[in-house]
Protein backbone atom coordinates (compact mmCIF):
# COMPACT_ATOMS: atom_id res chain seq x y z
CA UNK A 1 0.00 0.00 0.00
CA UNK A 2 1.43 3.36 -1.05
CA UNK A 3 0.20 6.16 1.20
CA UNK A 4 0.67 9.84 1.85
CA UNK A 5 -0.11 11.13 5.33
CA UNK A 6 -1.13 14.80 5.39
CA UNK A 7 -1.95 17.02 8.33
CA UNK A 8 -0.99 20.32 9.87
CA UNK A 9 1.79 20.73 12.43
CA UNK A 10 0.67 19.10 15.68
CA UNK A 11 -1.83 16.75 14.01
CA UNK A 12 0.11 13.63 14.99
CA UNK A 13 1.39 12.66 11.52
CA UNK A 14 4.73 11.36 12.73
CA UNK A 15 3.17 9.43 15.59
CA UNK A 16 0.53 7.88 13.35
CA UNK A 17 3.06 7.10 10.61
CA UNK A 18 5.20 5.20 13.13
CA UNK A 19 2.12 3.24 14.25
CA UNK A 20 1.08 2.52 10.65
CA UNK A 21 4.62 1.36 9.82
CA UNK A 22 4.31 -1.36 12.46
CA UNK A 23 0.74 -2.31 11.54
CA UNK A 24 1.20 -2.38 7.77
CA UNK A 25 4.84 -3.55 7.79
CA UNK A 26 5.90 -0.91 5.26
CA UNK A 27 8.54 1.81 5.63
CA UNK A 28 7.76 5.29 6.92
CA UNK A 29 9.48 7.88 4.75
CA UNK A 30 9.73 11.31 6.36
CA UNK A 31 11.12 13.90 3.97
CA UNK A 32 12.67 15.76 6.90
CA UNK A 33 14.50 12.63 8.06
CA UNK A 34 15.44 11.79 4.47
CA UNK A 35 16.90 15.25 3.96
CA UNK A 36 18.94 15.05 7.18
CA UNK A 37 20.28 11.57 6.36
CA UNK A 38 21.30 12.60 2.81
CA UNK A 39 23.17 15.61 4.23
CA UNK A 40 24.92 13.47 6.87
CA UNK A 41 25.80 10.80 4.27
CA UNK A 42 27.30 13.46 2.02
CA UNK A 43 25.47 12.30 -1.10
CA UNK A 44 25.52 14.67 -4.10
CA UNK A 45 21.91 15.68 -3.39
CA UNK A 46 22.70 15.97 0.31
CA UNK A 47 25.61 18.29 -0.43
CA UNK A 48 23.38 20.45 -2.66
CA UNK A 49 20.75 20.59 0.09
CA UNK A 50 23.35 21.46 2.72
CA UNK A 51 24.61 24.37 0.63
CA UNK A 52 21.07 25.71 0.10
CA UNK A 53 20.17 25.37 3.80
CA UNK A 54 23.44 27.05 4.86
CA UNK A 55 22.28 30.12 2.93
CA UNK A 56 18.98 30.04 4.83
CA UNK A 57 16.95 29.04 1.78
CA UNK A 58 14.37 26.29 1.37
CA UNK A 59 15.48 23.12 -0.39
CA UNK A 60 14.09 23.08 -3.93
CA UNK A 61 11.41 20.70 -5.12
CA UNK A 62 13.95 19.26 -7.59
CA UNK A 63 16.33 18.28 -4.78
CA UNK A 64 13.50 16.79 -2.69
CA UNK A 65 12.10 14.78 -5.59
CA UNK A 66 15.64 13.57 -6.39
CA UNK A 67 16.01 12.33 -2.81
CA UNK A 68 12.60 10.66 -2.97
CA UNK A 69 13.47 9.01 -6.27
CA UNK A 70 16.61 7.58 -4.70
CA UNK A 71 14.71 6.37 -1.62
CA UNK A 72 11.85 4.85 -3.62
CA UNK A 73 14.32 2.80 -5.66
CA UNK A 74 15.18 0.73 -2.56
CA UNK A 75 13.73 -2.78 -2.35
CA UNK A 76 12.02 -2.26 1.01
CA UNK A 77 9.32 -0.10 -0.65
CA UNK A 78 8.15 -2.83 -3.04
CA UNK A 79 5.13 -3.62 -0.82
CA UNK A 80 4.46 0.07 -0.18
CA UNK A 81 5.38 3.02 1.99
CA UNK A 82 3.99 5.81 4.14
CA UNK A 83 5.15 9.24 2.98
CA UNK A 84 5.03 11.94 5.65
CA UNK A 85 5.85 15.62 5.09
CA UNK A 86 5.50 15.58 1.31
CA UNK A 87 3.86 16.88 -0.82
CA UNK A 88 3.34 20.32 0.72
CA UNK A 89 2.20 22.14 -2.41
CA UNK A 90 0.61 21.43 -5.77
CA UNK A 91 3.86 21.35 -7.75
CA UNK A 92 5.26 18.76 -5.32
CA UNK A 93 2.07 16.68 -5.68
CA UNK A 94 2.45 16.73 -9.47
CA UNK A 95 6.16 15.84 -9.20
CA UNK A 96 5.34 12.93 -6.87
CA UNK A 97 2.70 11.71 -9.32
CA UNK A 98 5.25 11.77 -12.13
CA UNK A 99 7.84 9.96 -10.04
CA UNK A 100 5.42 7.22 -8.98
CA UNK A 101 4.23 6.83 -12.59
CA UNK A 102 7.87 6.28 -13.57
CA UNK A 103 8.02 3.42 -11.04
CA UNK A 104 4.59 2.16 -12.16
CA UNK A 105 3.20 2.42 -8.64
CA UNK A 106 0.58 5.16 -8.11
CA UNK A 107 -0.62 6.16 -4.67
CA UNK A 108 -3.37 4.02 -3.16
CA UNK A 109 -4.58 6.63 -0.69
CA UNK A 110 -3.88 9.99 0.90
CA UNK A 111 -4.90 10.23 4.57
CA UNK A 112 -5.69 13.76 5.77
CA UNK A 113 -5.61 14.05 9.57
CA UNK A 114 -8.14 16.70 10.54
CA UNK A 115 -7.68 18.50 13.85
CA UNK A 116 -9.34 21.80 14.86
CA UNK A 117 -7.02 24.82 15.07
CA UNK A 118 -7.59 25.37 18.80
CA UNK A 119 -6.54 21.77 19.52
CA UNK A 120 -3.43 22.14 17.32
CA UNK A 121 -2.44 25.38 19.07
CA UNK A 122 -2.90 23.71 22.46
CA UNK A 123 -0.85 20.65 21.42
CA UNK A 124 2.02 22.65 19.93
CA UNK A 125 2.11 25.24 22.70
CA UNK A 126 2.09 22.44 25.29
CA UNK A 127 4.87 20.60 23.50
CA UNK A 128 6.88 23.83 23.18
CA UNK A 129 6.49 24.58 26.88
CA UNK A 130 7.62 21.06 27.79
CA UNK A 131 10.66 21.45 25.51
CA UNK A 132 11.41 25.00 26.69
CA UNK A 133 10.80 26.58 23.27
CA UNK A 134 9.76 30.19 23.48
CA UNK A 135 9.16 30.67 19.74
CA UNK A 136 5.99 28.56 19.66
CA UNK A 137 3.64 31.17 21.07
CA UNK A 138 -0.06 30.72 20.25
CA UNK A 139 0.14 33.57 17.69
CA UNK A 140 3.23 32.11 16.01
CA UNK A 141 1.56 28.69 15.89
CA UNK A 142 -1.59 30.15 14.33
CA UNK A 143 0.53 31.86 11.66
CA UNK A 144 2.34 28.58 10.85
CA UNK A 145 -1.00 26.81 10.62
CA UNK A 146 -2.33 29.47 8.23
CA UNK A 147 0.74 29.10 6.00
CA UNK A 148 0.23 25.31 6.05
CA UNK A 149 -3.45 25.63 5.18
CA UNK A 150 -2.79 28.09 2.35
CA UNK A 151 -0.17 25.89 0.68
CA UNK A 152 -1.78 22.51 1.35
CA UNK A 153 -5.43 23.25 0.48
CA UNK A 154 -4.76 22.82 -3.27
CA UNK A 155 -2.98 19.51 -2.56
CA UNK A 156 -6.03 18.24 -0.68
CA UNK A 157 -8.25 19.27 -3.60
CA UNK A 158 -5.87 17.56 -6.05
CA UNK A 159 -6.15 14.22 -4.27
CA UNK A 160 -9.87 14.63 -3.59
CA UNK A 161 -10.46 15.08 -7.34
CA UNK A 162 -8.58 11.83 -7.95
CA UNK A 163 -10.80 10.03 -5.44
CA UNK A 164 -8.00 8.86 -3.15
CA UNK A 165 -8.34 11.36 -0.28
CA UNK A 166 -9.46 9.91 3.05
CA UNK A 167 -10.35 12.44 5.75
CA UNK A 168 -9.77 11.14 9.28
CA UNK A 169 -10.58 12.81 12.59
CA UNK A 170 -7.19 13.25 14.29
CA UNK A 171 -8.54 14.11 17.74
CA UNK A 172 -8.38 11.46 20.45
CA UNK A 173 -6.02 8.90 21.89
CA UNK A 174 -3.33 7.38 19.69
CA UNK A 175 -5.18 4.07 19.44
CA UNK A 176 -8.49 5.77 18.58
CA UNK A 177 -6.98 7.75 15.71
CA UNK A 178 -5.04 4.68 14.52
CA UNK A 179 -8.28 2.70 14.47
CA UNK A 180 -10.02 5.41 12.42
CA UNK A 181 -7.16 5.35 9.91
CA UNK A 182 -7.31 1.55 9.66
CA UNK A 183 -11.07 1.66 9.05
CA UNK A 184 -10.67 4.39 6.40
CA UNK A 185 -8.01 2.28 4.64
CA UNK A 186 -10.08 -0.88 4.93
CA UNK A 187 -7.41 -2.70 6.98
Curated annotation (Swiss-Prot):
Q: What ranges does the record give for the region LID, renumbered to this chain?
A: 126-136
Q: Which SUPFAM superfamilies match?
A: P-loop containing nucleoside triphosphate hydrolases
Q: Which reaction does it catalyse?
A: AMP + ATP = 2 ADP
| InterPro entries cross-referenced by the UniProt entry | Adenyl_kin_sub, Adenylat/UMP-CMP_kin, Adenylat_kinase_CS, P-loop_NTPase
Gene Ontology MF term list: adenylate kinase activity; ATP binding
Keyword Transmembrane attached: no
Which residues take part in binding ATP?
10-15, 127, 172
Q: Which domain of life is it from?
A: Bacteria
Name a biological process GO annotation.
Answer: AMP salvage
Q: What subcellular locations does the record give? A: Cytoplasm
Self-association and partners: Monomer.
Q: What is this protein called?
A: Adenylate kinase
Give the organism the record lists.
Xylella fastidiosa (strain M12)
Amino acid sequence: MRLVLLGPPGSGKGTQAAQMKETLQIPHISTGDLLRSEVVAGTPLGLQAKQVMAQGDLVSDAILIGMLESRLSHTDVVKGFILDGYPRNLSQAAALDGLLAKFGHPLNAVVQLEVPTDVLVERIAGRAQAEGREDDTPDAVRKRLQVYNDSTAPVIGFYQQRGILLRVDGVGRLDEVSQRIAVALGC
